[in-house]
From Swiss-Prot:
Database matches in Gene3D superfamilies: Hypothetical protein af1432 (1.10.3210.10)
GO biological process per UniProt: dGTP catabolic process
SMART domains named among the record's database cross-references: HDc (SM00471)
Superkingdom of source: Bacteria
Organism: Rickettsia akari (strain Hartford)
UniProt-recorded Gene Ontology molecular function terms: dGTPase activity
Occurrences of domain HD (ranges): 62-198
Pfam family, one: HD
UniProt protein name: Deoxyguanosinetriphosphate triphosphohydrolase-like protein
């Protein structure tokens, strides 16, 4: 039974374009299915989490990460008697707007777009789901419920100060109450993202030999798990050891999140979702001790993994690809597919830049590499191939 402060699908604020609900799914289950069936969701399997897609079959990509986040979000929401369907759905959609090549790709595209109001993957997720996906005859986008869109756009909390152009534009027709906190389910999805990525980036980084178990001594609380497991299982393999460490880490983080959130709910005597949205802090949270550990772990990953020689070298190449593609399309829009070129307002540089950014952001790693090799290479064979495939 849902708590009184849960997001009840029967009491949803509905969709921008009115629809008759189905009898066999609730509104949030319907949204989950719509997201899974988008082209953008399928493309996530070929988009970088930390390691480029072709570097290894077992490294996580944006799709596997999103699935892992959704399982954590669903479990936490279910334990708190919240809508597990809503938490799962928001988690599945939270990375849809990411560029190829992960954060390196986003930084590169944002730099290209600095004269055209920049680029934000969070705003791009909203744009994909409300405009760019073309699946229905009656409207653009996939017409999700208010609660799902709110949860996606407030992934990092209330939006104050300068508001992204597309978010502001969409908000005029469907007010997402940007200045308030999102539902408890959306807050769960956000912290499930933190739990998943810090745990699994550690695992993948050890698998890629960017860091080793000795490096984890910098993180005392994780090193303690390593020590205990080695003491208990004398001949444990390295691969099994990191799996067990990640398992313990995730259990600790989830247990802590549940405990602190229950404390917050009881302290505030929350009885409805309105109170959650209008608190002056996020109701779903870790303890202060665990928040400090998460910050420490993020700093460790940033310094030892994301800024490592291997990742930095790859990031430089990825930056070159994104910026190179942006330049060639800006120089000649005829290199764009016809259906994308038609979206550009004639002789409007701003419109051209925005359409090109949308096109590049939707690329997978491998398509961006292929496109760069064909459009930015002087190899004569690529020029001949270009004539057949793109003109």
């Amino acid at each position: 039974m849902l708590a009184s402060y849960a997001s009840d699908p029967l009491k949803s604020r509905g969709r921008l374009y009115k629809e008759i609900p189905t009898s066999y799914r609730n509104e949030f289950e319907c949204d989950r299915d719509r997201i899974i069936n988008t082209n953008a969701f399928r493309r996530l399997q070929y988009k970088t989490q930390v390691f480029i897609n072709h570097e290894g079959d077992h490294y996580r990509n944006r799709l596997t990460h999103s699935l892992e986040v959704s399982t954590v979000a669903r479990s936490v929401a279910n334990t708190l008697n919240l809508s597990s369907d809503l938490a799962e759905t928001i988690a599945l959609a939270h990375d849809l707007g990411h560029t190829p090549f992960g954060h390196a790709g986003e930084r590169a595209l944002n730099e290209c777009m600095k004269e055209y109001s920049g680029f934000s993957h969070n705003a791009q997720s909203l744009k994909i789901l409300t405009l760019l996906e073309k699946r229905y005859a009656a409207y653009n986008g996939v017409n999700l419920t208010w609660e799902v869109l709110e949860g996606i756009i407030k992934h990092n909390g209330p939006i104050t100060g300068e508001i992204n152009e597309y978010i502001a534009e969409y908000n005029k027709q469907n007010d997402l109450e940007l200045s308030t906190y999102a539902s408890a389910e959306a807050q769960i999805a956000s912290l499930a993202d933190d739990i998943s990525y810090i745990s699994h980036d550690l695992e993948d980084s050890i698998g890629a030999k960017i860091i080793d178990f000795n490096s984890l001594a910098e993180l005392k609380y994780i090193d303690q798990h390593v020590f205990e497991l080695k003491s208990k299982f004398k001949n444990i393999s390295s691969s099994c050891l990191i799996y067990e460490v990640v398992r313990k880490l995730m259990h600790e983080l989830i247990t802590d999140l549940l405990w602190q959130t229950k404390e917050n709910l009881n302290k505030e005597k929350i009885i409805n979702i309105y109170e959650i949205r209008h608190l002056n802090y996020q109701i779903v949270d870790f303890t202060e001790k665990t928040n400090d550990r998460i910050k420490e772990t993020k700093k460790f990953l940033h310094e030892r993994v994301y800024k490592s020689n291997k990742i930095t070298a790859i990031s430089l190449k990825c930056t070159k690809i994104v910026q190179g593609l942006f330049k060639v399309y800006m120089d000649d829009i005829n290199l764009l597919p016809v259906n994308w070129k038609m979206l550009i307002d004639s002789d409007d540089t701003y419109s051209k830049a925005r359409v090109i950014a949308d096109y590049i952001a939707g690329m997978t790693d491998r398509f961006a590499i292929q496109e760069y090799n064909q459009l930015c290479s002087l190899n004569f064979n690529n020029i001949l191939k270009l004539n057949y495939e793109y003109i």
